[in-house]
Regions:
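C-terminal functional module detector
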Residues: 18-76, 80-83, 87-134, 138, ...
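The substrate-binding groove and active-site-proximal loops of carbohydrate-active enzymes
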Residues: 65-70, 159-172, 223-236, 328-338
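Low-complexity, serine/threonine/proline-enriched polar segments
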Residues: 133-157
Length: 540
């Protein structure tokens, strides 16, 4: 299947085994981080018309509980080495390396809940290695290992810490290591690094005692400085409490945003039309959500959350990389409330009713890799979960033992429902004046961003009143487009004139030619949300 990018403009928004082994840190420490950043920043030339930068803000290392258990031993330093184009070791032993150019920006996003706890449990002599759960977790009985892992997963889901192993000092230490690594590897103008982590809230269906849950995860990204202690689902499973904490951080001078991901398996809760506690949405909710969550991660290894065939029956590509199983289950997620295009349209309805829109977000892509680096290419794909899905046979994508067919082969249910349905997605694209924390973060705040499923095509869009057709041949096209309108992510103020749009796209030279450029329009009219698709340009 060819990878693609859908340029969606909606409404008025343009928009467990072994001990630990580390990888050698090859960072040059001859200068302090502050000296290095100041020196590099002084040499950067800003481009007022902006350049596109590609990055990944969803990456896990051994400090995530659901990575270490699957033999992941990579560190935050490995994340940044991979982003720079260096090879790092996959848990099964082979080396992985990014295809194409190095990334422009990146962030390590280990789970805040139990960050660094499993490595401590697996360290000889550490107090946590002596607790019964650790002995079971790193024992030899697969069934008991699974039960021990489920104990931690159940704690994350419930928000109730498992006190025997929950040591906040260890979490704080792992978080500091992540921050320090981001600061060490920050090279303004070359590689922008962000301190970040994942907030891992999970919903539960009423009356359902299974482990199935809806994904309400967010990646929390700090512009520059980060606090000594993070806020995880073991503090509260309510994302609105996370926003309150983020507001406090911002008041202390530390700007921060949360980026939701995998709304496709949120059981319809990510873009629900009520609050977490089931109350009606109001203006205050909408304004707080947009301040804290201006972006959503629309595509990644566990599927694409743009739309669904049931929501967009007239869109022939609405089934692209659809993944529907709830977390840790084979139960299908509810569709409504789980997809971006529907949410953007519903946001217009809510704005009419409350005076504010809670779903006026931009989009990015990311990998959600748990092995320090994403594949981004189906031709060289190592999936996500360490030793579980590193090869086509392990993923259930090819028959075992050299067989040519699946006849007589018993299919592994986890591979059948999960691994074989995942893909080599995705990347965030950001239009910014320069490759620095301040500039990249500001671009994300204003939503001048887009998502790709891996390829690095360049896409721009502007809306305005009075763009002339000869603008396409103007040497100053971009400058005039900015001067006469707003870019993707901006708000185009309504007037009595029909708007015009400037759309520009360039293929990734390492990937397939562009097949089609489309605009997707969503609007709210006469009590109904509607959607239409327009072909802007098509290949021969």
């Amino acid at each position: 299947m060819n990878k693609f990018l859908s340029a969606s403009i909606l409404a008025v928004t343009l928009g467990a085994c072994g001990g630990q082994t580390g990888t050698e840190n090859k960072t040059d420490h001859s200068k302090s981080p502050a000296e290095t950043v100041e020196s590099a920043a002084s040499e950067i030339v800003k481009n007022p018309n902006k350049d596109v930068f590609f990055g990944d803000l969803h990456i896990h290392t051994k400090n995530s509980f659901d990575a270490y258990i699957f033999n992941v031993r990579s560190t935050p330093d490995d994340v940044y080495r991979f982003a720079k184009g260096e090879a790092v070791r996959h848990p099964v032993g082979f080396e992985i390396k990014i295809g194409g150019d190095p990334l422009d920006f990146v962030g390590t996003t280990d789970h805040g809940a139990y960050m660094g706890i499993l490595p401590a449990m697996d360290t000889d002599g550490h107090p946590l290695s002596k607790v019964e759960l650790a002995k079971t977790m790193f024992g030899t009985d697969p069934e008991l290992i699974t039960q021990a892992f489920a104990t931690i997963g159940g704690s994350v889901r419930s928000g109730i810490p498992f006190e025997e192993i929950y040591d906040r000092d260890i979490v704080d230490s792992a978080w500091k290591q992540s921050i320090d690594a981001a600061n060490r590897h920050y090279e303004p103008g070359k590689l922008t690094t962000f301190s970040a982590y994942e907030y891992t809230s999970v919903t539960v269906r009423p009356g359902d005692e299974s482990f199935a849950g809806g994904n309400l995860h967010r990646n929390v990204v700090f512009e520059n400085e980060a606090p000594k202690r993070l806020f995880s689902t073991l503090d509260s499973t309510n994302p609105e409490d996370l926003w309150d904490w983020m507001d406090t951080e911002r008041a202390a001078g530390r700007d921060v945003m949360a980026i939701p991901h995998n709304s496709n398996v949120s059981d319809g809760k990510m873009f629900d039309l009520v609050t977490y506690e089931g109350k009606p949405l109001d203006k205050a909710y909408a304004e707080q959500r947009m301040l804290n969550e201006p972006l959503v991660e629309m595509t990644q290894v566990k599927g694409t959350s743009e739309t669904h065939p049931a929501l967009s029956p007239n869109d022939e590509w609405a089934d692209f990389e659809i993944y529907e199983d709830l977390l840790s289950s084979y139960i299908k997620s509810k569709i409504n409330g789980g997809y971006v295009r529907e949410a953007l349209a519903n946001g217009l309805k809510i704005e009419q009713e409350t005076g504010a829109n809670p779903f006026k977000f931009g989009m990015i892509g990311a990998s959600d890799t748990h092995v320090a680096g994403g594949a981004f290419d189906e031709k060289d794909y190592w999936s996500k979960v360490g030793i579980l899905d590193a090869t086509p046979i392990a993923r259930g994508s090819a028959p075992p033992g050299g067989a040519k067919t699946w006849e007589g082969v018993e299919r592994d249910q986890n591979a059948e429902h999960w691994f074989s349905k995942w893909g080599a997605s995705g990347l965030a694209a950001v239009w910014a004046e320069e490759n620095t924390r301040e500039s990249i973060f500001a671009a994300m705040r204003r939503k001048e961003t887009y998502a790709t499923s891996g390829p690095r095509m360049k896409v721009r869009m502007f809306g305005g009143y009075g763009y002339d057709t000869d603008l396409l041949d103007d040497a100053d096209m971009i400058a005039k487009a900015y001067a006469g309108g707003v870019p993707m992510g901006g708000d185009l103020v309504k007037n009595n004139t029909a708007p015009s749009f400037l759309v520009w796209a360039m293929r990734d030279p390492r990937n397939a030619p562009l097949q089609r450029l489309q605009m997707v329009k969503s609007w709210y009219e006469n009590g109904e949300t509607r959607e239409a698709l327009y072909d802007i340009a098509c290949s021969d």
